[in-house]
């Protein structure tokens, strides 16, 4: 093992935060210094030149001055027996640079602590601050790190002696192995193995437990029910299926695959043909949808828990039918009270929590980062979400008790597209090769399916450790590229059948694959790729290593599939063959035995059906006491409640523009305020048809009325999607995610009531279908504290996600109030019809109460009338702005619209019934519309005709105040800025805790700046003019190399932009160049695309660059290309970072900076304002002086120069092409207008001759006007950024 020191691991503010944590923990620590230390496991000693090369590869990131460390060493490394995602990607880079002697690279952080002598307890506390015990360990000596590379002999399987010891042997195994088997399942297994006359092996029992866990089998949803002594006619699942039986319209696949599929629109899918040439293929683009939960792992270890939750859901989408394409994601979190240090709220009590789970604050600090990082790196925009905090002692169905989300909800979902011929899975032919695609087996995530089926607190902590997984999104991206190449072959797609590997690992995935395909299988255990040779058969077969798929490929198609995988560098292995007989055999060549030898029917057969005999309960809770509520104080509290408050800290960490197909993200208007009701995507680059998704959940209402909570969730999802141009209820499909504490008094009967309310009643009445969903039935946390038994039980929680096909994405209405549209009026559509019920509201929550009666959808006809009327108005563009009424009531709806439009309001409540508090804060269904004053009465009449109450409630103010009156009486008045400050303080506090606090403060102050102009546009050219048109007509299109490396994810939209400009875009993978399949001699232009090459592990773009510089063939190819006078190149984002590290082979680039970690130390996804500078860049000719917004998505975009002198030279060279500016056109120096902290706002630069241009922002994602988060009304189909690509075509003549 070689040990190689790296750069300092913590910036100044990170060290400060760590020191503060030490002070808060009363640790006598004086100083901490941290640096990366790299460990290399070698097959033989390196030569001097090889060692130097390895040291260069391991030199990356910002230039921070190292110093000689002092103090005690605490060395944090990944847990032995695991391989970190960093390790696998860094090792790939070393191999691609020709260092074959490096078996594996690993990285740790060496902390040097100067302190007084620490007690054993203090040492443990300090270690707790330095590492995540779920995925890391702390060593006191570098030499001890060799345990990371220790290889142990494989362990054999173990048998459980049922034949001799009977049922008792299985009962013991059930507890020891954490199998979560029910009594009748133990009986079933004993009976079957006695019949087979043999003992079960541990691997067979674990496989059975996973395949039959509540998590996988949904036993409660398939159970027979008796409630209050009366047998119920249907199971829960049958009631859900009733929605499909009633309205099967437009559903192509339901209840049988990894995701549901509905009919989409016809458009031109843009992808490369087998020769690599990108083009449009006009065909139906059907829409798949899926929403998953990953609650248990997120409670244990939030970052990997949420990351692998997102990853698993993305795999479900990719593994739908015979392979498909994930497109856009959504996310959701429900947690207990945050109790932000220094910002604890009056309603946040301190009830405690068990040690084995983390706090709500930890979950919301780390979990969203994990989920966002996975989506970012995979390349899926995250466009929608919800966030609720709830933890309260209330009187509900089971008397007085604490209800809340100690076991959190972590929701991950999304939509994708699938070809018509691939919607149904194919036939698995006898003799077909059964393949695992993706990463290696690792000893992690064991028993996740069974573990998440238990209430938190029933399994031992060691088993909780085992059920945490690791994420490697860059690997999943490679696998998805393989799936893409396969579906792009149409009827020649080699994939017959595909499933993702999730809970239970291969032990669940392979049996499911062959069983669904009507086959059996013979498998060879030792063919499973594994990084840990010491694993037992159970560990190899049942571990939940991520980023894996299982699939069947006909033997004759194996060479084609192999070639695709090798080009994409996606690992795969043939593990078995499909058999006619439905039997499962797993052979182990190492021990020459069969750890599994079972008929499939024993594993997946008629395990006993569950029966639930339950009693219903009625909630009795006093009415909300209104007399002590002051409107001004109520406003302050409600705007500080995380459920209502600004969610920026959850949004800007997630890429929202990748694909170039995003039409509507969360951020609205020129001030980019996160208040959008739904997300909208374009079907492709050549159409205005698209897809929309929204969410609805009103979980606290279930503490009063289960049915109301369910109806309100469905209704809220419809109210949210109503601003998109969908047309009919039948074009909307719902995913239902049900969370409940099964067995808790009253909850089972309540769950039945809720499912019945939507499955049997509401959805059929509205022609809505629920073709997909998920359940999580163990939403309770139990523990002992100071000798007392404590529990926190979640409310029955239904989260609805609505997916719709959009007719015209240009018609989407947002909450942005417009003060430039003449005289306008605000209308309140009140589906609550004046009932003003306050039970379960945010108002009740912030005063520590529950209230007595929940709001409800009393008549489905109200929702039908609203939606159908709204859709007609949206299609005719009669609505200027729209926002639904939900959490926080009418007051919140109005002020959020005011924030988005940067305007004041003048509101009159006199048309509404009830007290001030009821009118402002009730959360009945409803919405506010801004319409032209001339149309207002006509529109109000249309709603009234549809049976929906509608009231005129005011207009925009001439000043920046929100004034609310009841006739002449003033009810409330405050400045918009003061309200925005209250609303945004929660996000500021969370950002300051998690990111660079200086950046968080700058953003908070910007939100309070009344003079901020937001995004402004000033163009020096006409964007509607196609300057390339005369050249396109001349003849053959010039060839453009659309260059990607493993992990790049922005190549398709880049190809589309150059295609529109008249180029022939060709897909070129680095493996094509390294293998000699393709030469850059063939191309006039090259573009290095954005993404996460090698997952950015050795510095963003640096690993990619080094694999060129240290590979002779690649270096020659690129050197010759850049030396050619006729060639040109563009590097965007990751491509910019990569090219900036190739300075030594690019003429005229000596003055370029490197691009390193953002000042905020956070991935920044922003819609930022830039100005084009006067420069020789051929891409920006005729554009100088233009100011316009552009997509920014990067974690390492800070331009770092070697010295102040180097920066001055770059400025003097006249090659700076692009700068961040503010709305006045001044250079942006403050965050987030300068999102990465680059000096002088620098974000684009070129060579001295202008042939090679680098830029961090993404023009290819916004070349269509509809792909811009905000744009002036007068822009046509092409945004101004299209000019860049056309300039490149003009340059070639």
Swiss-Prot record:
ATP binds at residues 305-316, 676, 886. It catalyses: N(2)-formyl-N(1)-(5-phospho-beta-D-ribosyl)glycinamide + L-glutamine + ATP + H2O = 2-formamido-N(1)-(5-O-phospho-beta-D-ribosyl)acetamidine + L-glutamate + ADP + phosphate + H(+). Mg(2+) binds at residues 677, 716, 720, 884. The keyword Magnesium applies. Residues 1040-1293 form the Glutamine amidotransferase type-1 domain. Residues 305-327 are annotated as: Disordered. Pathway: Purine metabolism; IMP biosynthesis via de novo pathway; 5-amino-1-(5-phospho-D-ribosyl)imidazole from N(2)-formyl-N(1)-(5-phospho-D-ribosyl)glycinamide: step 1/2. Its main location: cytoplasm. It is found in: Cytoplasm. It is an enzyme of class 6 (ligase). Its EC number is 6.3.5.3. GO terms for biological process: 'de novo' IMP biosynthetic process. InterPro entries: Class_I_gatase-like, FGAR-AT_N, FGAR-AT_PurM_N-like, PurL_large, PurL_linker, PurM-like_C_dom, PurM-like_C_sf, PurM-like_N_sf. The active site is at residues 1133, 1258, 1260. The keyword Transferase does not apply. GO terms for molecular function: ATP binding; metal ion binding; phosphoribosylformylglycinamidine synthase activity. Monomer. Phosphoribosylformylglycinamidine synthase involved in the purines biosynthetic pathway. Catalyzes the ATP-dependent conversion of formylglycinamide ribonucleotide (FGAR) and glutamine to yield formylglycinamidine ribonucleotide (FGAM) and glutamate. NCBIfam families: FGAM_synt, PRK05297.1. This is Phosphoribosylformylglycinamidine synthase. It comes from Shewanella sp. (strain MR-4). The gene is purL.
């Amino acid at each position: 093992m070689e040990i190689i020191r790296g750069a300092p691991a913590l910036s100044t503010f990170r060290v400060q935060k760590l020191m503060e944590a030490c002070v808060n923990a009363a640790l006598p620590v004086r100083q901490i210094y941290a640096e990366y230390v790299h460990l290399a496991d070698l097959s033989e000693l390196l030569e001097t030149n090889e060692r130097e090369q390895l040291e260069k590869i391991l030199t990356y990131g910002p230039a921070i001055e190292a110093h000689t460390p002092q103090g005690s060493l605490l060395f944090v490394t990944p847990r032995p027996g695991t391989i970190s995602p960093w390790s696998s990607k860094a090792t790939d880079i070393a191999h691609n640079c020709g260092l074959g002697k490096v078996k594996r690279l690993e990285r740790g952080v060496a902390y040097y602590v100067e302190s007084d002598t620490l007690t054993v307890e203090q040492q443990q506390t300090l270690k707790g601050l330095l590492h995540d015990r779920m995925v890391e360990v702390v060593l006191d000596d570098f030499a001890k790190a060799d345990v990371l590379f220790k290889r142990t002999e494989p362990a054999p399987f173990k048998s459980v002696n049922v034949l001799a010891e009977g049922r008792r042997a299985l009962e013991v195994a059930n507890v020891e192995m954490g199998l979560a088997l029910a009594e009748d399942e133990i009986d079933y297994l004993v009976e079957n193995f006695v019949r087979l006359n043999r003992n079960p092996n541990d691997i067979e029992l674990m496989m059975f437990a996973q395949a039959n866990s509540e998590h996988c089998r949904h036993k409660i949803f398939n159970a027979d029910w008796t409630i209050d002594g009366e047998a119920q006619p249907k199971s829960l699942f049958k009631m859900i299926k009733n929605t499909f039986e009633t309205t099967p319209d437009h559903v192509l696949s339901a209840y049988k695959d990894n995701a549901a599929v509905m009919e989409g629109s016809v458009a031109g899918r843009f992808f490369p043909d087998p020769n690599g040439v990108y083009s449009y293929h006009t065909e139906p683009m059907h829409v798949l949808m899926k929403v998953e939960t990953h609650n248990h792992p997120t409670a244990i270890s939030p970052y990997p828990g949420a990351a692998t939750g997102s990853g698993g859901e993305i795999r479900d989408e990719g593994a739908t039918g015979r392979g498909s394409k994930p497109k856009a994601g959504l996310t959701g979190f429900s947690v207990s009270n945050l109790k932000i240090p220094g910002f604890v709220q009056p309603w946040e009590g301190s009830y405690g929590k068990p040690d084995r789970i983390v706090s709500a604050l930890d979950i919301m600090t780390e979990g969203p980062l994990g989920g966002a990082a996975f989506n970012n790196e995979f390349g899926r925009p995250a466009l929608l979400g919800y966030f609720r905090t709830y933890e309260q002692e209330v009187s509900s169905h089971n008397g007085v008790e604490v209800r809340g989300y100690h076991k959190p909800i972590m929701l991950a979902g999304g939509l994708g597209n699938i070809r018509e011929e691939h919607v149904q899975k194919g036939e698995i032919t006898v003799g077909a090769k059964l393949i695992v695609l993706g990463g290696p087996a690792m000893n992690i995530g064991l028993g996740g399916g069974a573990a998440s089926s238990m209430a938190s607190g029933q399994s031992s902590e060691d088993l909780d450790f085992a059920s945490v997984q690791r994420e490697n999104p860059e690997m999943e991206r490679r696998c998805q590229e393989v799936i893409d190449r396969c579906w792009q072959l149409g009827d020649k797609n080699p994939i017959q059948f595909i499933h993702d590997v999730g809970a239970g690992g291969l032990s669940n995935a392979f049996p499911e694959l062959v069983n669904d395909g009507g086959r059996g299988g013979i498998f060879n255990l030792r063919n499973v790729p594994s990084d840990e040779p010491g694993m037992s058969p159970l560990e190899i077969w049942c571990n939940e290593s991520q980023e894996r798929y299982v699939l069947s490929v006909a033997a004759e198609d194996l060479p084609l599939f192999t070639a695709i995988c090798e080009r994409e560098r996606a690992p795969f292995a043939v593990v078995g063959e499909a058999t006619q007989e439905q039997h499962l055999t797993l052979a182990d060549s190492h021990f020459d035995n069969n750890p599994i030898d079972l008929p499939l029917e024993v594993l997946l057969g008629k395990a006993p059906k569950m029966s639930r005999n339950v009693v219903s309960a009625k909630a009795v809770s006093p009415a909300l006491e209104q007399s002590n509520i002051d409107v001004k104080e109520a406003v302050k509290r409600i705007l500080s409640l995380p459920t209502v408050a600004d969610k920026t800290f959850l949004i800007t960490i997630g890429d929202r523009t990748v694909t170039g197909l995003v039409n509507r993200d969360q951020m609205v208007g020129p001030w980019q305020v996160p208040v959008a009701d739904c997300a909208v995507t374009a079907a492709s680059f050549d159409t205005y048809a698209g897809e929309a998704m929204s969410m609805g959940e009103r979980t606290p209402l279930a503490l009063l009325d289960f049915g109301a909570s369910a109806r309100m969730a469905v209704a809220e999802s419809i109210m949210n999607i109503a601003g998109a141009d969908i047309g009919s209820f039948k074009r909307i499909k719902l995913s239902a995610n049900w969370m409940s504490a099964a067995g808790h008094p009253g909850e089972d009967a309540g769950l039945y009531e809720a499912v019945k309310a939507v499955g049997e009643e509401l959805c059929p009445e509205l022609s809505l279908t629920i073709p997909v969903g998920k359940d999580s039935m163990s939403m309770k946390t139990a523990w002992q504290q100071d000798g007392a038994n404590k529990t926190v039980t979640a409310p029955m929680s239904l989260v609805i996600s609505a997916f719709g096909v959009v007719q015209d994405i240009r018609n989407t209405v947002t909450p942005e109030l417009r003060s430039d549209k003449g005289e306008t009026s605000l209308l309140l559509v009140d589906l609550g019809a004046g009932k003003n019920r306050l039970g379960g509201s945010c108002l009740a929550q912030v005063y520590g109460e529950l209230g007595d009666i929940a709001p409800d959808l009393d008549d489905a006809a109200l929702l039908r009338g609203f939606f159908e009327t709204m859709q007609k108005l949206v299609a005719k563009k009669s609505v200027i702005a729209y926002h639904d009424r939900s959490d926080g009531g009418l007051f919140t709806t109005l002020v959020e619209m005011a924030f988005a439009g940067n305007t004041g309001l003048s509101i009159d409540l006199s048309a509404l019934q009830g007290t001030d508090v009821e009118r402002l804060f009730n959360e009945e269904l409803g919405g506010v519309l801004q319409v032209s004053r001339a149309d207002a009465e006509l529109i109000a009449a249309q709603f009234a005709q549809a049976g929906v109450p509608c009231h005129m409630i005011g207009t925009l103010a001439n000043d920046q105040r929100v004034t609310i009156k009841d006739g002449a009486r003033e009810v409330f008045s405050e400045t918009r800025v003061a309200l925005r400050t209250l609303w945004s303080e929660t996000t500021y506090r969370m950002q300051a805790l998690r990111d660079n606090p200086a950046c968080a403060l700058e953003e908070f102050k910007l939100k309070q700046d009344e003079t901020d102009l937001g995004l402004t546009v000033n163009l020096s050219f006409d964007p509607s003019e196609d300057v390339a048109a005369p050249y396109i007509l001349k003849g053959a299109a010039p060839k453009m190399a659309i260059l990607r490396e493993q992990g790049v994810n922005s190549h398709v939209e880049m190809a589309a932009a150059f295609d529109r400009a008249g180029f022939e875009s060709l897909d070129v993978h680095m493996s094509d160049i390294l293998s000699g399949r393709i030469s850059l001699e063939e191309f006039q232009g090259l573009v290095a695309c954005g993404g996460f090459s090698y997952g950015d592990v050795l510095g963003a773009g640096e690993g990619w660059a080094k694999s060129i510089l240290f590979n002779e063939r690649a270096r020659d190819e690129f050197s010759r290309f850049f030396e050619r006078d006729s060639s040109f190149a563009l590097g965007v984002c990751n491509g910019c970072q990569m090219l900036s590290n190739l300075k030594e082979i690019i003429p005229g680039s000596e003055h370029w900076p490197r691009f390193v970690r953002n000042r905020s130390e956070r991935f920044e996804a922003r819609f930022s304002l830039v100005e084009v500078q006067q420069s020789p860049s051929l891409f920006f000719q005729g554009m100088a002086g233009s100011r316009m917004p552009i997509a920014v998505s990067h974690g390492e975009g800070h331009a770092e120069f070697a010295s102040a002198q180097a920066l001055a030279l770059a400025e003097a060279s006249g090659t700076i092409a692009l700068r961040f500016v503010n709305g006045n056109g001044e250079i942006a120096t403050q965050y987030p207008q300068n999102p990465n902290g680059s000096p002088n706002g620098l974000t684009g630069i070129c060579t001295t001759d202008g042939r090679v241009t680098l830029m961090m922002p993404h023009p290819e994602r916004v070349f269509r006007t509809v792909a811009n988060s905000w744009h002036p009304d007068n822009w046509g189909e092409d945004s101004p950024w299209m000019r860049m690509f056309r300039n490149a075509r003009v340059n070639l003549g």
